[in-house]
Every structure is written in structure tokens, then in C-alpha cells.
Amino acid sequence: MVRIEELKAGPALVVCALVVNQRNETAEYLTALSPKGRKRLDYVFQRLAELGRAGFRDETFKRLEGVVCEIKEHGTNTRLFCFTSGDRLIVCTHAARKPAGNVRYQAEIDRVRRLYELCQIEGVLS
């Protein structure tokens, strides 16, 4: 079973977390962050909701491939992966540490793409 939970909503975008089989990896990640790290990501979510993707430089919110994006959490070198759906929805799926060096995360990108396709099949994004 797949569903989405709203994290922040604004005039530009709605930022959500993906829940798969009653597990919300985004919420687990946010809960594990320090209060300072959580505050930074809350600010990013709020800014996305209010201003949309145009409100960021590439290093904070970056499109990786197609609908797959990442949100950079500066304090821990962790990336929160997400996908976009339509003009107004960003769905966060999970987090992962950035590998050393300038490496692409193809496995993470593939995972987000599979979750996006699952959401489309189950009609969650309509």
C-alpha cells in the first residue's frame, strides 16, 4: 500500500513524504536528525512550498534525472531523494549518505524512479 503525507504546503508547491507499506522513511530520517538539521530541512521545505524550485541554487535542490531530485542537507552530507509530479508536487522518498568524491547515485536514482512508477500504478499522484 502506497500513500503520501503532506509535510508543507504553500502557494508554489506541496512537499510530501512517501509512505510504503506503512513505513515513512522520510519521517524516520527527519526524526533521526539533530534539532539544527531538522530546522534546516524545515526551512528548505517551507521555502519550496512558498517559492517553488526557482527559490534555490542548484546545490540545495537539484534535479538529477527526469523527475528525480535531491535535497542536500548541508550538516551531514546526506541527500533526501524525491520526485516531482506535475507542477505542484514534490514527494520525498528516502535519504542516503553521499558517497565520497563526485559520484552519481545510480542505485538511489533507480529506486526513486521505481517508487514514482509504483505511485503512478496505484493512482496516488492523481
Mark where each language-model region is.
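Basic, Lys/Arg-enriched alpha-helical interface segments
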Residues: 1-77, 86-90, 97-126
